[in-house]
Amino acid sequence: MSDIKEFISNGFVIKRKLFSNEEIDKLNQYIAIRQDKEKSARETTTSTGKLTMTMWNHPSEDLFGKFSTNERIVKPMEIFLNDEVYHYHSKIIWKNPGDGGFDWHQDYGYWYHNACLYPDMASCFIMLDKANKENGCLKVLKGSHRVGRISHARSDTPEQTADNERISELEKRHESVYIEAEPGDALFFHANLLHASDANKSQNSRRTLIVCFNTKSNN
């Protein structure tokens, strides 16, 4: 199956070794030196513990910006979404040993409230560390983007997640796929694809750089 057919059918595409070990090592070294002091970090409490993320809206001229606007990400995005795209925002998920996961949700469940009329949006999830079930890798409901936007609400924690009743039914019909991957691998996924992650039960970090895009016609 071609990448575009896979994206349309499943809602996601995995590109192995989109970035080399050297490129990821360089980015990780840059993160360690910068400690991301100039970005806005925030900690949230989820159903399985705390989770820290760093988010920014405008790609700068630094190494973060170079990754966020790299043609290896942008060109596939424009093919998958069939339109010119622009950088919506980027973030780093800092998932240290013992940190929590995140319940099932859709990105468009949030972005819908930012005056984005259509779900013609997607994200690229770049692995900075090895990702596996033990350290809380991402998991997706294959093909769930086709159900459309699901209502999101707060449960017992500050996070907003997808309606539990609908999730229960969808889990019966859609395969849950764990995205186990190596540093430099990347996951492209539709804004309506349901995704989640479990807590990090390992002794290793699971950091990811996520670059999100909107289509020009949806601005």
Question: Predicted regions span which residues?
Answer:
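Non-heme Fe(II)-dependent double-stranded beta-helix
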Residues: 2-10, 15-115, 153
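Short hydrophobic-aromatic micro-motifs
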Residues: 14, 124, 187-189
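Non-heme Fe(II)/2-oxoglutarate
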Residues: 34-46, 183-188, 192-219
